[in-house]
């Protein structure tokens, strides 16, 4: 995967992977196409993981792209879980309120693999960076709204 591509390009490659695999399976004699699709997917997922792990989300484009990853209905769940894992490693190293906010959104995802992973990561990050959260009032407000929503849904 070329470094010049953005989040939307990476997302398109990852979203198209199930279709690419289905087409390759229709042509069992064409092993080269299958290998190419697998390499493209693996390279894209790896590049997305490494750039998410190693970067702060300083600009709005990166944050918008991460929301698109979370909201994509075509993205395989394993790829979204990999992205969530990159956020865990990044937050363990350096607290980023935008990534933590993304985790709060991921905790309400429809897929249980994603939302449970996000909840566990939130607990880990709150343990590691317990003193940091109060430095971000907007993030504390979002956490409060999240806890009220989950408490209300548990009571109903």
Where are these regions (language model features)?
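Eukaryote-biased recognition of long, low-complexity, charge-rich segments
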Residues: 135-156
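Alpha-helical solenoid scaffolds in large eukaryotic transport, assembly, and signaling factors
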Residues: 5-109, 114-115, 121-135
